[in-house]
């Protein structure tokens, strides 16, 4: 009799423990869902191309400029920032050869071939360009570190050029991770905190920008509605802890460069047009795979084809090439001394 009573008591305790564990799981899931679905409530007004009230932020104080610059200075510097797994810190920025199939090479290479070095210098950012998946033993650099390296390298190149050639103009373009970097630099320049003055930037084009935001910059062609994955997944602590900080909207948008910054995004590309349901905090391996671009559908890899994005018969790379060519052809001709 006593033995049966003990068994019954043990069963009751086991049921209570199971119920308590289930309650904990439900509470954790509820908290995560609330965090994921709560509306953004930043301490500062949401970033936009203009601050509230339509008052344009004045650009930073411009550096004094001479009447002429050195004879070896190019009139224009084209900054090309490749995407994930399409660059290397050991590649030659003026003659990159390690990734001949890089998407950006379809733009930068024809430009370098068309214009002489006195008119145009094409600089392809050499950086690690990786995306470590913490659920795989891939020995890759983390997205945070790769993105920061690309940013530092590009800013230094532009700063060095501006110090040596203060009258040189700039054309900036990037793809995927490179588009995030290019967009961040454009945002800094347009808001008076960048490596060069905003009036020296002829234009910016971002292909598959992970921080794309509706109403910020100029949408080109058949872009879908939506926002970049870094905005959709903003403020998800689990990703930051994994070296994948999703940085959200750019503070101040593109500022004074808003009407000179183009956004290109293919329909179905979850990197630049990411609905909330495309990612799941409960399935981080799948989310990380999508973020790396390998599971963003075929769209993310096909901007050099007309399959998912075409404007007036041109692919995204053809459109960007023509856009950049026109900017270079019509750029100022600084005096040389």
From Swiss-Prot:
Top-level taxon in the UniProt lineage: Bacteria
MF annotations from Gene Ontology: carboxylic ester hydrolase activity
Keyword terms: Cell membrane, Disulfide bond, Hydrolase, Membrane, Serine esterase, Transmembrane, Transmembrane helix
Pfam family, one: Cutinase
Top EC class for this record: hydrolase
Regulation: Inhibited by tetrahydrolipstatin (THL), a specific lipase inhibitor.
Transmembrane segments: 15-35
Official protein name in the record: Carboxylesterase Culp6 homolog
């Amino acid at each position: 009799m006593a033995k049966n009573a003990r068994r019954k008591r043990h069963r009751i305790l086991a049921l209570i423990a199971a119920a308590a564990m289930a309650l904990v799981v439900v509470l954790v899931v509820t908290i995560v869902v609330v965090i994921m679905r709560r509306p953004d409530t930043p301490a500062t007004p949401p970033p936009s191309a203009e601050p509230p009230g339509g008052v344009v932020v004045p650009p930073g104080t411009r550096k004094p400029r001479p009447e002429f610059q050195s004879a070896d200075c190019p009139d224009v510097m084209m900054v090309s920032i490749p995407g994930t797994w399409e660059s290397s810190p050991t590649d030659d920025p003026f003659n990159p050869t390690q990734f001949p199939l890089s998407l950006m090479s379809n733009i930068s290479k024809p430009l370098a071939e068309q214009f002489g070095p006195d008119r145009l210098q094409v600089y392809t950012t050499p950086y690690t360009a990786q995306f470590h998946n913490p659920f795989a033993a891939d020995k890759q650099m983390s997205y945070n570190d790769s993105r920061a390296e690309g940013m530092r390298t590009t800013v230094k190149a532009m700063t060095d050029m501006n110090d040596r050639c203060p009258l040189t103009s700039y054309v900036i373009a990037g793809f995927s991770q490179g588009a995030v970097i290019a967009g961040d630099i454009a945002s800094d320049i347009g808001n008076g905190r960048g490596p060069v003055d905003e009036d020296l930037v002829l234009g910016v084009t971002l292909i598959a920008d992970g921080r794309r935001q509706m109403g910020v910059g100029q949408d080109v062609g058949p872009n879908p509605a939506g926002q970049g994955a870094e905005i959709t997944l903003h403020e998800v602590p689990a990703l930051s802890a994994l070296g994948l900080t999703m940085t959200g909207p750019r503070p101040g948008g593109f500022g004074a460069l808003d009407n000179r910054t183009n956004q290109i995004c293919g329909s179905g590309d979850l990197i630049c047009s990411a609905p909330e349901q495309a990612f799941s905090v409960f399935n981080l391996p799948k989310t990380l795979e999508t973020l790396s671009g390998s599971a963003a559908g075929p769209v993310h890899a096909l901007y050099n084809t007309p399959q998912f994005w075409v404007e007036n018969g041109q692919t995204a790379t053809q459109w960007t090439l023509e856009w950049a060519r026109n900017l270079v052809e019509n750029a100022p001709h600084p005096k040389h001394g």
